[in-house]
Amino acid sequence: MKYIDEFRDGEVAKGLAEAIRREANPARSYHFMEFCGGHTHAISRYGVSDLLPANVKMIHGPGCPVCVLPIGRVDQAIRLALEQGVTLCTYGDCLRVPASDALSLMKAKARGGDIRMVYSSADAVTLAQKNPDKQVVFFAIGFETTTPPTAVAIKQAAALGLKNFSVLCCHVLTPSAISSILESPEVRQWGTVPLDGFIGPAHVSTIIGSRPYEFFAEEYRKPVVIAGFEPLDVMQAIKMLIRQVNEGRAEVENEFSRAVDRDGNLKAQQLVAEVFEMRKNFEWRGLNILPYSALRIRSHFAEFDAEKRFPLGYASVPDHKACECGAILRGVKRPQDCKIFGTVCTPENPVGSCMVSSEGACAAHYTYGRYKDVA
């Protein structure tokens, strides 16, 4: 298949692996963070780490939207379904995220909550149209990739004059998060590993372009290479990062030029800016409260804001004591460093959110890498 098969070619991968080995200076080590969960999945699925020299290490980042969703936000969604009696719609990955009191949206559904999996925000709008006597709430999560469809849904609901549709907005921002990771006193206090550069996300960058990464590449002297999700994309990005480090450069380079340019999708950006504005603070699982790292619905569309329509409130809830999900999201620990990984915590019985989503570091390692821990 065009744009897939050629980026999974084994012979080319061998050549790239050799090129990376030649490029890497054996006298030093390299630590690169793949921010996006899609890259984490690709690295695990295709065994990219096994093709790298021993001194080139990949660190999992917090770029999995389900993984960074704090328990308190899931609790809000559950309360909407069980206490307010709304029809709650959300993406499939959200259904099994552990919440307070051993609950999840799936378990809340078993208790009688009207909770439905949808494939897009448009499905929730259609449901509200067909059920005018029911309050329908769309639990909106994700980075910049899924934000424009939510904006479209809100504008569509406004155009249709729907009074029974609202959105619980938990959309978060990639560049703000990376900057906050690099400068946050809480993160420094927790002690993250040293980072030599980032593999920038693919789908997010199709929306925002490469321009937003330039600030922290210049400000923090960390090179960034935006890469696609195929194994050869990732390997080429690693080679480009190693070369930047060796040459003392800290620039934003674009390996994924077949889909990403510097400016991104301007129409989508304008749409998001029309419907949403920055939140002053937002809690991320594992990263505490990060300033200006998430979006909320503008006052012009306040009638579609579930946080204003329903008496929700927000309470921060700590993670399970045995769960290392927070440390894994910060890049401090690996999935195999968690005592309950693969025993108490499995994809069938997730204790932490990193085991829930297919983009989560723990789920990826459980599926593709745990056999190496025993070998």
Q: Where is each model-derived feature located?
A:
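Metallocofactor- and cofactor-centric catalytic cores in central/energy metabolism, strongly enriched
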Residues: M1-D133, T147, A157-L160, S166-L168, ...
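A generic structural motif
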Residues: M58-P65, F165-L173, V225-L232, E255-R258
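Glycine-rich, mobile lid/loop segments that gate access to catalytic sites or pores
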Residues: T145, A151
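Short, conserved secondary-structure transition motifs
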Residues: C170-S179, G264-A268
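A conserved active-site cap/scaffold subdomain adjacent to cofactor or substrate pockets
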Residues: R188-D261
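Internal helical hairpin/lid segments
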Residues: M235-A327
